[in-house]
């Protein structure tokens, strides 16, 4: 997997974190450096750790699905992408009610925004991709996108539209990466 694909994957995965960060930034009237750091650090850390967990799990079963690994990666990426696209059209309010940069809420948001990365880690194992570079890129991109999302959300009147558009774009990118994987395996 080349660097541009890894970067696109990282950007797509960071869209959930970005969308939540925009909403959190909109909700937090006083956005301090400490709050920015806490949310950005945790989102980046969880986004980096979840693919490792998925990759390690995937390595255990990769020999059983080797002939179909590209299909597994395609299905997982498309499933994640489709869910992100579906969620981008969700009209229910997802703005946190309490400080999202503290305590259990911070951990739960970090987990929720990084679950897609778990499945991506499994896909990377199926494709026999080294995990080191993707993990670093995914973590750094998530950290930066969270930081930017917090700042944007804090300066906007309505965070919902930008956050949902980011989630829609992220879902589309994941689906395109899935199609690219099939193309690389000469499926079409």
Curated annotation (Swiss-Prot):
Pfam families registered for this protein in UniProt: Mntp
Gene Ontology cellular-component terms listed: plasma membrane
Membrane-related topology note: Multi-pass membrane protein
Keyword hit for Transport: yes
Keywords (A to Z) from UniProt: Cell inner membrane, Cell membrane, Ion transport, Manganese, Membrane, Transmembrane, Transmembrane helix, Transport
Record keyword Repressor present: no
A GO MF label: manganese ion transmembrane transporter activity
Domain of life assignment: Bacteria
TM regions (residue ranges): 6-26, 36-56, 60-80, 106-126, 131-151, 168-188
Coiled coil: none
Cystine pairs: none
Localization in the cell: Cell inner membrane
InterPro entries xref list: Mntp/YtaF, Put_MntP
PANTHER family: MANGANESE EFFLUX PUMP MNTP-RELATED
Role noted for this protein: Probably functions as a manganese efflux pump.
Entry-linked HAMAP family: MntP_pump
Homology family: Belongs to the MntP (TC 9.B.29) family.
The name this protein goes by in its record: Putative manganese efflux pump MntP
